[in-house]
Amino acid sequence: GHFWSSDAFADDVRRRGALLEERLARIAAEHGFETRGRGMMRGINVGSGERAGAITAACFDAGLIIETSGAHDEIVKVLAPLVIDDALLSAGLDILETKIREAMADDYAVAAE
């Protein structure tokens, strides 16, 4: 059968979208943030453009290209290809999770000064 007409492809994309949703929801919940979007176009509202910018810059330095969106660029947005390999998607989300944790730790440190 043709690649694009296969149910297996559609099922794979749906499954990957669910995996992405689950990981982002867990990351967001850890910091009291909310997720946005659907399917493979999802993000986390981190509360400010300044914070989102710091997170995306840190991700970029770690090899993950990720961008911001939203009225105030407050959403860190994952735009993974539909055909991304699960291991690669997980590795990217690991980087995102770490960089959000680090950014929040920096925020707490600044607040405590």
Enumerate the language-model features and the residues they cover.
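Conserved N-terminal phosphate-binding loop of PLP-dependent enzymes in the Aspartate aminotransferase
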Residues: 1-113
